[in-house]
């Protein structure tokens, strides 16, 4: 069984553990006696995978940090006077100090190996769509929206091109938005005045794909759009008539095949 470890060797299902210690047992509603909070927080900072790892073991009292262990320092240090006795005591205990120093490997690198396959190595390809924010005639100010959604990890590069040339002015981005399901989304907008015949391209680079994703938006005049819609409508109408004709033909054929010559015994 593979499990996440806490400093000290015990297996847990969380990387960060919060321990709350109250001054008395849970009180009934209406009890106004003071409460006191003691909270340890353990952090692993990874640089270039596990090439360099920094471990922090931090302790808070009433939301104020009092003492910490930093693997880059190698011992406990008091952050406030309240934490000085703890720092001095833990540094005097050889087993506690050795355990904290070893946590870079026994805690951080161990847990990195457990979760790496579904966190660091996880890849989800983005979905890209392009559309104008407003429906209006050409040669009017508009905002072209490149919607990039459902991707992981969050490192992504979105660029706009006009007729093959990169556009850097007039770009507005929402930044990364977390979807709450381990995926991200972002909107990158381009302020422009579209003219007939222009081709706008949104290009997306992401670790989940080997080559950039591109989606085009072509500026068309109202007459060109109406011609295109008429063509599509005529094509769909033709398919409907073709389907109806084939249906009638095969139905008639089936009816004729069921007739038998007079006097024929089967």
Curated annotation (Swiss-Prot):
Q: Which residues are glycosylated?
A: 48
Q: Which GO terms describe its cellular component?
A: autolysosome membrane; cell surface; clathrin-coated endocytic vesicle membrane; endocytic vesicle membrane; ER to Golgi transport vesicle membrane; external side of plasma membrane; extracellular exosome; extracellular space
Please tell me, according to the UniProt entry, what happens when changing residue 38 to E: In allele DRB1*03:01, allele DRB1*03:02, allele DRB1*04:01, allele DRB1*04:02, allele DRB1*04:04, allele DRB1*04:05, allele DRB1*04:06, allele DRB1*04:07, allele DRB1*04:08, allele DRB1*04:10, allele DRB1*04:11, allele DRB1*08:01, allele DRB1*08:02, allele DRB1*08:03, allele DRB1*08:04, allele DRB1*10:01, allele DRB1*11:01, allele DRB1*11:04, allele DRB1*11:06, allele DRB1*11:11, allele DRB1*11:19, allele DRB1*12:01, allele DRB1*12:02, allele DRB1*13:01, allele DRB1*13:02, allele DRB1*13:03, allele DRB1*13:05, allele DRB1*13:07, allele DRB1*13:12, allele DRB1*14:01, allele DRB1*14:03, allele DRB1*14:05, allele DRB1*14:06 and allele DRB1*14:07; requires 2 nucleotide substitutions
Q: What is the effect of changing residue 66 to F?
A: In allele DRB1*07:01, allele DRB1*14:01, allele DRB1*14:05 and allele DRB1*14:07
Q: What is the effect of changing residue 209 to L?
A: In allele DRB1*04:01, allele DRB1*04:02, allele DRB1*04:04, allele DRB1*04:05, allele DRB1*04:06, allele DRB1*04:07, allele DRB1*04:08, allele DRB1*04:10 and allele DRB1*04:11
Q: Which residues lie on this side of the membrane: Extracellular?
A: 30-227
Mutagenesis or variant effect for residue 100 to R: In allele DRB1*01:01, allele DRB1*01:02, allele DRB1*04:04, allele DRB1*04:05, allele DRB1*04:06, allele DRB1*04:07, allele DRB1*04:08, allele DRB1*04:10, allele DRB1*04:11, allele DRB1*07:01, allele DRB1*08:01, allele DRB1*08:02, allele DRB1*08:03, allele DRB1*08:04, allele DRB1*09:01, allele DRB1*10:01, allele DRB1*11:01, allele DRB1*11:04, allele DRB1*11:06, allele DRB1*11:19, allele DRB1*12:01, allele DRB1*12:02, allele DRB1*13:05, allele DRB1*13:07, allele DRB1*13:12, allele DRB1*14:01, allele DRB1*14:03, allele DRB1*14:05, allele DRB1*14:06, allele DRB1*14:07, allele DRB1*16:01 and allele DRB1*16:02; requires 2 nucleotide substitutions
Q: What is the effect of changing residue 107 to V?
A: In allele DRB1*07:01 and allele DRB1*09:01; requires 2 nucleotide substitutions
Q: What is the effect of changing residue 178 to H?
A: In allele DRB1*03:01, allele DRB1*03:02, allele DRB1*08:01, allele DRB1*08:02, allele DRB1*08:03, allele DRB1*08:04, allele DRB1*11:01, allele DRB1*11:04, allele DRB1*11:06, allele DRB1*11:11, allele DRB1*11:19, allele DRB1*12:01, allele DRB1*12:02, allele DRB1*13:01, allele DRB1*13:02, allele DRB1*13:03, allele DRB1*13:05, allele DRB1*13:07, allele DRB1*13:12, allele DRB1*14:01, allele DRB1*14:03, allele DRB1*14:05, allele DRB1*14:06 and allele DRB1*14:07
In the record, the effect of residue 103 to R is given as: In allele DRB1*03:01 and allele DRB1*03:02; requires 2 nucleotide substitutions
What's a single GO MF annotation on this record? structural constituent of cytoskeleton
Crosslink position(s): Glycyl lysine isopeptide (Lys-Gly) (interchain with G-Cter in ubiquitin): 254
Per the UniProt entry, the effect of residue 125 to Y is: In allele DRB1*04:01, allele DRB1*04:02, allele DRB1*04:04, allele DRB1*04:05, allele DRB1*04:06, allele DRB1*04:07, allele DRB1*04:08, allele DRB1*04:10 and allele DRB1*04:11; requires 2 nucleotide substitutions
Q: What is the effect of changing residue 218 to S?
A: In allele DRB1*08:01, allele DRB1*08:02, allele DRB1*08:03 and allele DRB1*08:04
Consequence when changing residue 55 to L? In allele DRB1*01:01, allele DRB1*01:02, allele DRB1*10:01, allele DRB1*12:01 and allele DRB1*12:02
Return the SMART domains for the record. Answer: IGc1 (SM00407), MHC_II_beta (SM00921)
Q: Its GO biological process terms?
A: antigen processing and presentation of endogenous peptide antigen via MHC class II; antigen processing and presentation of exogenous peptide antigen via MHC class II; detection of bacterium; epidermis development; humoral immune response; immune response; inflammatory response to antigenic stimulus; macrophage differentiation
- Notes concerning its domains: The beta-1 domain is a structural part of the peptide-binding cleft. It contains one alpha helix and 4 beta sheets, respectively forming part of the wall and the floor of the peptide-binding cleft. The other 4 beta sheets of the floor and the second alpha helix wall is formed by the alpha-1 domain of HLA-DRA. Forms hydrogen bonds with the peptide main chain via conserved amino acid in most HLA-DRB molecules. The polymorphic residues accomodate the side chains of the peptide conferring peptide specificity to distinct HLA-DRB1 alleles. The beta-2 Ig-like domain mediates the interaction with CD4 coreceptor.
Disease implication from the record: In populations of European descent, allele DRB1*01:03 is associated with increased susceptibility to Crohn disease and colonic ulcerative colitis. Decreased heterozygosity in individuals with colonic ulcerative colitis suggests that it acts as a recessive risk allele. Sarcoidosis 1: An idiopathic, systemic, inflammatory disease characterized by the formation of immune granulomas in involved organs. Granulomas predominantly invade the lungs and the lymphatic system, but also skin, liver, spleen, eyes and other organs may be involved.
What's the name of the protein? Answer: HLA class II histocompatibility antigen, DRB1 beta chain
Source organism of the structure: Homo sapiens
Lineage, highest ranks first? Eukaryota, Metazoa, Chordata, Craniata, Vertebrata
Q: Corresponding gene?
A: HLA-DRB1
